[in-house]
């Protein structure tokens, strides 16, 4: 039986990562014991993937319109607007 080591996206730990149930869509969730963060490897909605927020902000800073950003990224217009609205808050 092959084992796959899962790395925590927050603290990069491989030891202490355990399975932590499933999401409502049936995707496996993981828990990092050292930092107590939870995450899943598969996303039901593409706007939840890591890095999407920063790509939307970068496109806006380079002059790409909201509708064009939504079309290119494959997310809804309201999602782009929400990311831009929340980008001014502390991250």
Curated annotation (Swiss-Prot):
Name of one Pfam family that matches: HTH_Tnp_IS1
S-S bonds: none
Keyword Zinc carried by entry: no
One BP annotation, GO: DNA transposition
Keywords from the UniProt entry: DNA recombination, Transposable element, Transposition
Function per UniProt: Absolutely required for transposition of IS1.
Protein name: Insertion element IS1 7 protein InsA
Annotated organism of origin: Escherichia coli (strain K12)
Gene: insA7
């Amino acid at each position: 039986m092959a084992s796959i080591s899962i790395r925590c996206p927050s603290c990069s730990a491989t030891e202490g990562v355990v399975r932590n149930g499933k999401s409502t869509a049936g995707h496996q969730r993981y828990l990092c014991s050292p930092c107590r963060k939870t995450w899943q490897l598969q996303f039901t909605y593409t706007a939840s993937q890591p890095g999407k927020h920063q790509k939307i902000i970068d496109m806006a800073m380079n002059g790409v319109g909201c509708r064009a950003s939504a079309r290119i990224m494959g997310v809804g217009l309201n999602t782009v607007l929400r990311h831009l609205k929340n980008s001014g808050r502390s991250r």
